[in-house]
A protein has these predicted regions:
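A contiguous catalytic/ligand-binding core that recognizes phosphate-bearing ligands
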Residues: 4, 30-44, 49-51
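Short histidine-centered beta-strand/loop micro-motifs
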Residues: 8-9, 30-32, 59-61
């Protein structure tokens, strides 16, 4: 099971859509069923705390015109990884460590997401589209 070692994130944004899920719903093989995600409209000027027990997609714009967002992360988050870390092997994550894309940043991608080949593509189900 994925553990959460970092703190919450704080987001203050223009109107945007935030797609969230629960860390507890990640399967033993680190896959995640996208049907468990929920989309929320966040009105402009609203502060949102995304708890460390949450999964989230990158925020999405509402009107196709883009948006601005300020995200406050725990110190060191998204810094380059230091030391040796496990890698995705033949499409499988041998451990949680293989999901680390940067310091304090675990990544589970979708096959349609355009991620680098070495990324773990464990999002199972429909690639969510907020325009529908």
């Amino acid at each position: 099971m994925l553990r959460s070692l970092v703190g919450s994130e704080m987001c203050i944004r223009d109107s945007a859509i935030l797609i969230l899920g629960l860390l507890a719903d990640v399967a033993e093989d680190f896959t995640y069923d996208t049907s468990k995600m929920e989309a929320f409209l966040v009105p402009a000027g609203t502060g949102v705390e995304v708890f460390a027990t949450s999964l989230h997609y990158a925020p999405c714009g509402v009107d196709g015109q883009g948006f601005q967002v300020a995200i406050v992360l725990p110190q060191g988050t998204n810094y380059p990884l230091e030391g040796a870390h496990q890698k995705v092997e033949q499409g499988k994550a041998p451990s949680e460590d293989a999901l680390l894309a940067a310091t304090n940043k675990w990544l589970i991608g979708h096959a349609e997401g355009g991620l680098p080949e070495e990324s773990f593509l464990g999002l199972v189900g429909e690639n969510l589209d907020v325009s529908k």
